[in-house]
């Protein structure tokens, strides 16, 4: 094992997570229909500021992310600062790392606090699958630019006459990888076939996720980290995630047909995450500053690591590459963990990663390590359910996982928790959290 990499300031202070909060997560075109991501971000940051009773002027920086970019608000972070009553002098910038976006925001803030350039900061992310940047065809886009430069009516007519009806049709956001043309679902199908992940195993994991998430809500474990969202037209507030199957029945999962490979496939709408709207944020500061302000940290950032692999095969295997790096940097092994929370983009992807965690062959051939990462104890794994149940607003999921894990570690008397996720582009992230 390599020498641990301590995430502390020059004075030896750890990076504390003082608060974490999120909106309820809503399926596309339901409770948050018509609400853009920037407004969801404003909601969660405003509520966090109100709950912590922290003077906004003390916040040095806000780092926020959004995966589905809106052209009218390209720097979502700055718009949140300007729209929540925070000091206009608060620095703000946006990040994007696909499904690992809010992990990246937290990592950036952590490094800034370590460097001493920032004392207190907010990190998070928001996404809306209900308010999408519907574009135009490349031919129409070029014509519009040319029209703007045309000098007379004849030139405009010549430009317009080249257009066909099909060129006028709206173009929805791409769902496939730019570099490969493959969708996430197609990659999940490939991983299911390559690693012999059965349909029954995928459905069982989805059923487990929904059952545990429903129980977590019933037990009141999530109420402190999710606030009731009041959004226009203010007809009915959303108090909790609306994707969770409250009475999940395993037998019902088998009734759904595969989506991405209709003949031989196993990935269905029930064992994949739905398109989701939501926002989440965490408040970070050096631990000494938390003491000065009389704030009790939820926990600390022990380590993090990012990874990148090929996009043509096993693109969603990022957790299996990032996790050993994060564990090494934390100076621990998988068996030292109290909790493990892996982003469930698809049941197939999750199960394939769990299989690789336990594989010595994978460790030797892909990681250059003698031993496997380790077999995951399912009693520690996604104990409150995962993204299959909660949903997945791309940029918000990381902050949800961090907050959820820290609260659960506190309920268990402390310990170490691992958060890990795959992301588009063959990216992966792993973060080790610590609670005393």
Curated annotation (Swiss-Prot):
Q: Which residues form the active site?
A: 99 (acyl-thioester intermediate), 392 (proton acceptor), 422 (proton acceptor)
Name its pathway: Lipid metabolism; fatty acid beta-oxidation
Say yes or no: keyword Cell division present. Answer: no
Its recorded reaction(s) are: an acyl-CoA + acetyl-CoA = a 3-oxoacyl-CoA + CoA
GO CC list: cytosol
- Molecular function terms, GO-annotated: acetyl-CoA C-acyltransferase activity
Q: Note the SUPFAM superfamilies from the entry.
A: Thiolase-like
Read off the Gene3D superfamilies from this record.
3.40.47.10
Q: Quick one: a GO biological-process term for this protein?
A: fatty acid beta-oxidation
Q: Does the keyword Aminoacyl-tRNA synthetase apply?
A: no
The record's listing under PANTHER family reads: ACETYL-COA ACETYLTRANSFERASE, CYTOSOLIC, ACETYL-COA C-ACYLTRANSFERASE
Family of the protein in this entry: Belongs to the thiolase-like superfamily. Thiolase family.
Q: Which NCBIfam families match?
A: AcCoA-C-Actrans, FadI, PRK08963.1
Assembly and oligomerization: Heterotetramer of two alpha chains (FadJ) and two beta chains (FadI).
**Function of the protein:** Catalyzes the final step of fatty acid oxidation in which acetyl-CoA is released and the CoA ester of a fatty acid two carbons shorter is formed.
Listed name of the protein: 3-ketoacyl-CoA thiolase
Q: Which species is this UniProt entry from?
A: Aeromonas hydrophila subsp. hydrophila (strain ATCC 7966 / DSM 30187 / BCRC 13018 / CCUG 14551 / JCM 1027 / KCTC 2358 / NCIMB 9240 / NCTC 8049)
Q: What is the lineage of its organism?
A: Bacteria, Pseudomonadati, Pseudomonadota, Gammaproteobacteria, Aeromonadales
This protein's encoding gene? fadI
